[in-house]
UniProtKB/Swiss-Prot annotation:
The gene is OSW5. Residues 1, 48-162 are cytoplasmic. Residues 23-26 are extracellular. It is found in: Membrane. This is Outer spore wall protein 5. One of its GO terms (molecular function) is protein-containing complex binding. Coiled coil: none annotated. It comes from Vanderwaltozyma polyspora (strain ATCC 22028 / DSM 70294 / BCRC 21397 / CBS 2163 / NBRC 10782 / NRRL Y-8283 / UCD 57-17). GO terms for biological process: ascospore wall assembly; lipid droplet organization. Involved in spore wall assembly. Pfam families: Osw5. It is a multi-pass membrane protein. The keyword Ion transport does not apply. One of its GO terms (cellular component) is lipid droplet. The chain crosses the membrane at residues 2-22, 27-47.
Length: 162
């Protein structure tokens, strides 16, 4: 039996083709499996992300509706006329009187400042520069400073408790 060169070359090429195919499959099959695992992970995490987003959106909508309902209820309970009736009348008169005293002090101090171009600082009066003019402010007795002091004490107590 005589074998021709073409038959020998055929078997050599067949052997090379099969060996290269097996070698490449050793790399391709595990990497293909890893790729499949990662693709499955992406799909699963995408699904979980969508589920959590939808549930968070539902919770947000429910809480938003509940808060709107609570705020509407609270606004129906508070009436502008009722809050004025609850104000302590002597305290209100005292505050108005003190406010007019402060305004008169400010006018007097402002006029003397313009005339003398020099303002004396008392213990109760602090100067504030507004547009280049010194304006005295009574920081110890005004209603605004009382509010500011109450806010400062609240802030100080919060800092102290933390």
């Amino acid at each position: 039996m005589i074998v021709s060169f073409s038959t020998v070359y055929f078997f050599i090429y067949l052997l090379l083709f099969v060996s290269i195919g097996l070698t490449s499959s050793l790399f391709i099959v595990p990497l293909l499996g890893a790729s499949f695992a990662f693709a499955s992970g992406v799909v699963i995490f995408g699904f979980l992300s969508n589920v959590t987003f939808k549930s968070a959106q539902t919770i947000y909508i429910k809480v938003d509706k509940r808060l709107k309902f609570i705020l509407a209820k609270m606004s129906s309970f508070t009436n502008g006329n009722e809050s004025e009736k609850n104000v302590d009348v002597p305290l209100l008169q005292q505050t108005k009187k003190r406010h007019s005293q402060i305004q008169s002090k400010l006018k007097n101090s402002f006029n003397t400042n313009i005339n003398n171009n020099n303002l004396t600082n008392n213990d109760n009066i602090v100067t504030s520069t507004t547009r280049g003019i010194d304006v005295p402010l009574d920081t110890n007795n005004s209603v605004t400073s009382a509010i500011a002091r109450s806010l400062e004490t609240r802030a100080d107590s919060k800092i102290a408790t933390n």
